[in-house]
Amino acid sequence: MQAKYSSTRDMLDDDDTTISLYSGTSTVTRRAEPRHSENGTPSSVWRPVALTLLTLCLVLLVGLAALGLVFFQFYQLSNIQQDSITEKDEKLGNMSRQLQSLQAQNRKLIETLQQVAVKLCRELYNKSGGHRCSPCPEKWKWYGDKCYQFYKESKNWQSCEYFCLADNATMLKISTQEELDFAMPQSYSEFFYSYWTGLSRNGSGKAWLWTDGTPYSFELFEIIIDPTNLRNRDCMTIFNGKAYSKDCKELRRCACERIAGRVVPGELQ
């Protein structure tokens, strides 16, 4: 075997050799070389992980900051929009109240204008015995808020009722003093013509009712009844300013009435 060292000097020059002087013999020992772990030191392993976590934390913080900024902007925008909506609601409420006030004033002006037109038209109508401003059909008489027609045709009571209905009217009704003052003078005739009214009863002793179902007022006028006549006298006529109970099958003239229309201001000229 070939010796590792050719001389003592060579052995001394070797850093890996140690001489023991205490034992009196030369003992050569080799310094153990440091072993490196295959996986490296712990610090070298955790450093990338820590950097990654730190990066993620920074990204998360930036995201939270951006989200907070967006939320703050949205909150400000929401408050601005809410204030704008509230302001618009207040303006809309004020405009609505103003519109209602203007509509009320407009209705009042229209009513006033209509009252003036009716008054003027009535003066023209009464002065000339008729005028184109009249709210009644041609040949109908205008009194109060109604139109009246006293026909010359003679029919029984039931036929007169149908006759009036066909003309968009009803049989004459006298329920106020004003209507009585107007209707009775129309009944004066030199030829004994009387007019059926809408008052009748369903047999002797029963209540007198108008065609609309309202009761007859005994205080307004008296119905003259002939107790000696055996025939049923359950329908009322007017003749020479008085009311009479007559047989409903007798032939009398028809008196009809209807609600007057509106006076057209343009027809006052």
UniProtKB/Swiss-Prot annotation:
GO molecular function: carbohydrate binding
Compartment list: Membrane
Topology relative to the membrane: Single-pass type II membrane protein
TM annotation in the entry: 52-72
Main location: membrane
Keywords, alphabetical: Disulfide bond, Glycoprotein, Lectin, Membrane, Signal-anchor, Transmembrane, Transmembrane helix
A GO CC annotation given for this chain: membrane
Pfam families registered for this protein in UniProt: Lectin_C (PF00059)
Disulfide bond annotation, renumbered to this chain: C164-C256, C235-C248
Domain (C-type lectin) ranges: 143-257
InterPro entries xref list: C-type_lectin-like (IPR001304), C-type_lectin-like/link_sf (IPR016186), C-type_Lectin_Domain_Fam1 (IPR052309), CTDL_fold (IPR016187), NKR-like_CTLD (IPR033992)
Side Cytoplasmic, residues: 1-51
Record bears the keyword Transmembrane: yes
Topology, Extracellular side: 73-269
Gene3D superfamilies: Mannose-Binding Protein A, subunit A
CDD domains in UniProt: CLECT_NK_receptors_like
Protein name in UniProt: C-type lectin domain family 1 member A
Organism listed in the record: Mus musculus
